[in-house]
A protein has these predicted regions:
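N-terminal nucleophile
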Residues: 1-139
Length: 139
């Protein structure tokens, strides 16, 4: 395993404000001075009034594609829904460059999407009615 300890969160409050946060221990045996995607706004984390995203994965590819921001930009400017935007980036664009990982994403309507292209990704969600989703693997 090359990844160690990424934690991310996205939230939508009662007033409709979206927020995202990402923290990570980074890659094992990373090169001294390497900066991954987690602290880079747009690559590992992004939130605006349409969408919030926290990402984990091979940072160089997430930086190159500006993954978190691009998901929200596709929702805002291309008219993609959250599922289409996040699935395209995570399942097609990142792997096409050789990277892997996943995201947790939330839109202003409360839709949640958590795609990943690895064997598993720890993830959970809860909605306003208290419905919970907790998972590691696809099913």
């Amino acid at each position: 395993s090359n990844y160690f300890g990424t934690v991310g969160a996205v939230a939508l409050d009662q007033k409709g404000h979206l927020a995202a946060a990402t923290s990570t221990g980074g890659m094992v045996n990373k090169r001294y001075g390497r900066v991954g995607d987690a602290p880079i706004i747009g690559a590992g984390t992004w939130a605006d009034e349409q969408c919030a995203v926290s990402a984990t994965g091979w940072g160089e590819y997430y930086i190159r594609l500006n993954v978190a921001h691009d998901i929200c930009a596709r929702v805002r400017y291309a008219g993609d829904d959250l599922a289409q935007a996040s699935d395209t980036l995570v399942m097609q664009d990142v792997p096409a460059l050789g990277g892997n990982g996943g995201v947790i994403a939330l839109d202003a309507r409360g839709n949640v999407r958590m795609p990943f292209n690895t064997s598993g990704m720890y993830r959970a969600a809860i909605d306003a009615e208290g419905k919970r989703v907790v998972a590691i693997y696809r099913d």
